[in-house]
Amino acid sequence: MAKKAPDVGNYQYGFHDEDVSIFRSERGLTENIVREISNMKEEPEWMLNYRLKSLKQFYKMPMPQWGGDLSELDFDDITYYVKPSENTERSWDEVPEEIKRTFDKLGIPEAEQKYLAGVSAQYESEVVYHNMEKELEDKGIIFKDTDSALRENEELFKQYFSTVVPAADNKFSALNSAVWSGGSFIYVPKNIKLDTPLQAYFRINSENMGQFERTLIIADEGASVNYVEGCTAPVYSTSSLHSAVVEIIVHKDAHVRYTTIQNWANNVYNLVTKRTLVYENGNMEWVDGNLGSKLTMKYPNCVLMGEGAKGSTLSIAFAGKGQVQDAGAKMIHKAPNTSSTIVSKSISKDGGKVVYRGIVHFGRKAKGARSNIECDTLILDNESTSDTIPYNEVFNDNISLEHEAKVSKVSEEQLFYLMSRGISEEEATEMIVMGFIEPFTKELPMEYAVEMNRLIKFEMEGSIG
């Protein structure tokens, strides 16, 4: 059995609703469960075979011996598939009332009405609501849940699925490949530039639940898309598992920005594989906000395949009591004149632990490639810790690599300066933290910047005394 989760304090999205699911698999991971998931979804035979092969791969692979402590994660105590409703609705009014109330509390309809081009909401294992502006459909943009894409766009789906993150990549990508459900599928045709964000929202509601969405984004030549996802879960005494796979293909001269704002409860293991292939003069941006969870292990990866390809990761990690944020980035330079940037901001308080773990690789063909890495950590008390673990591989002597790492505490001089102007110690500390994360929040859409600042302020409550 999974052990009792650590104290979660006043986590604001910790409410949970009565179980209204129409189907729930038995706990534990077996071949029968995998077949049941595929059968429920009425999938083609090739996908069932892919799932079963992935399950065998999962059993063969050992648990990671690096990163956070996974010893309490019990795969036999997890529910791998929960179907919350019969259909994916295109009208908000048609979403089941109990589920709608949850997303109303989280502001999903409000956010859509304000500025989103399309929105998808996943509850447990399935997308329960999906909508996109008609003018985008008229341009040939495909934005739907991944299960629908498999049914309705099978040829395009099969062309790209599992080409970026194969099942055998790691133990948790194998697990996802065996039991994946939901997620987003996006295809943007050649030279179509979408400035307004597409959004997906992922919510775990049940105890001991596993959520395994699979997201696949293809930006064709000269295309551009901005995708934003948000994640929350209730507070329970036992652990839940979120293990997603994200695959992105950025074709020649295309641009993708992928923004994540996660605020999981302290009983969630968040173990995610994100990777993109970036071709000639393409540009990939990861903007990654990591709050909450018991343990996060996530390292967005750019494989720079074509000359002039660019990749960047801008991340923030906040670890409080009982939390470990083991996050970072990977930049793989495979072509000439490629460039990458990693900016990592980490904050730890109340005994939390933050780890930056990154890889920058320069291949033999990466002549003229360059990479810049900046890791800044702010530690708010004597109980909290931080580690920086960079790993650089260089197989070409014509490259440029810069790495800067800095760990600091809130200084008495900073506090004295602010407090001498009538500001309390708690408010002064909050101001210093908000200034520290400003390079991250300024890259977010306005509504998300406001929400991120609010979440950080919420995490900061009670930091003094």
Curated annotation (Swiss-Prot):
InterPro entries: Fe-S_cluster_assembly_SufBD, SUF_FeS_clus_asmbl_SufB, SUF_FeS_clus_asmbl_SufBD_core, SUF_FeS_clus_asmbl_SufBD_sf, SufBD_N. This is Iron-sulfur cluster assembly SufBD family protein SSP1857. It comes from the Bacteria. GO terms for biological process: iron-sulfur cluster assembly. Transmembrane segments: none annotated. It comes from Staphylococcus saprophyticus subsp. saprophyticus (strain ATCC 15305 / DSM 20229 / NCIMB 8711 / NCTC 7292 / S-41). Belongs to the iron-sulfur cluster assembly SufBD family. Pfam families: SUFBD_core, SufBD_N.
